[in-house]
From Swiss-Prot:
Source organism (scientific name): Geobacter sp. (strain M21)
Presence of keyword Nucleotide-binding: yes
Record-level GO BP terms: queuosine biosynthetic process
Function: Catalyzes the ATP-dependent conversion of 7-carboxy-7-deazaguanine (CDG) to 7-cyano-7-deazaguanine (preQ(0)).
Name of the protein: 7-cyano-7-deazaguanine synthase
Sequence positions that bind Zn(2+): 188, 198, 201, 204
Domain of life: Bacteria
Gene this protein is translated from: queC
Gene3D superfamilies per the UniProt record, alphabetical: HUPs
Pathway recorded for this protein: Purine metabolism; 7-cyano-7-deazaguanine biosynthesis
Length: 225
């Protein structure tokens, strides 16, 4: 019987590659997306359109509103920085977001009798978010196996991070080798009303850098600067 895996799937470059990797590894992918009040709602439209064509057995969209808490340029009126990737944790960091996302994934995994979760975090070409680091994932996996019925019964739950040590260029090359169509992904934090990527936020800059280093043209549409 094919093993199930819950895939955290935003509709972005990394999570789409992650879904393709899980499928290649023989898992039946269950895609999990979140509408949490993010200003870049375009990613959800992409996720809804492409989860099943990408091979997801099911696609669950969970809705909650982190705008009530604020604290991030992605969930409040704070301006999205456009001056480049800096050294400090940027204002686009959403407090505890991956902890929240993984908790929903953990709950759905238990319901599905599933012991594998995939998340597309990356610790090389990234914005410096603390919940994208290997130490965080390791600690969360330890907690998950202490806090669940499956873990207590010895059915070890594993959090897979296949992109954690890859550059953005390597992620793109991996995805292309698996047939990922990157025109059907969205990365921009501050897109135009027509969906065009800004080309200047951290996420756009990292994406463009990755495509340039991979020697591939980015197929998404950008605003004319």
């Amino acid at each position: 019987m094919q093993k199930k895996a819950v895939i955290l799937y935003s509709g972005g470059l990394d999570s789409t590659t992650c879904l393709a990797i899980a499928k290649k590894q023989g898992f039946a992918p269950y895609a999990l997306s979140f509408s949490y009040g993010q200003r870049h709602q375009q990613e959800l439209e992409v996720a809804k359109l492409n989860a099943r064509p990408m091979g997801a057995v099911d696609h669950l969209l969970v809705e909650f509103d982190l705008r009530k808490m604020g604290g991030s340029a992605l969930t409040s009126d704070i301006e999205v920085p456009k001056e480049g990737v800096g050294e400090e944790i940027p204002v686009t960091y959403v407090p505890a977001r991956n902890t929240i996302f993984l908790s929903f994934a953990l709950g759905w995994a238990e319901t599905l009798d599933c012991f594998d979760i995939f998340i597309g975090v990356n610790a090389l070409d990234y914005s410096g978010y603390p919940d994208c680091r290997p130490e965080f994932i390791s600690a969360y996996e330890t907690m998950a196996n202490l806090a669940t019925k499956a873990g207590v019964e010895g059915k070890r739950l594993q959090i897979h991070t296949p992109l954690i040590s890859l550059t953005k260029a390597e992620i793109i090359q991996k995805g292309i080798s698996l047939g990922v169509d990157y025109s059907k992904t969205h990365s921009c934090y501050d897109p135009a009303e027509d969906g065009a990527a800004c080309g200047r936020c951290d996420s756009c800059r990292l994406r463009l850098k990755g495509f340039a280093e991979a020697g591939v043209t980015d197929p998404v549409r950008y605003q004319k600067l």
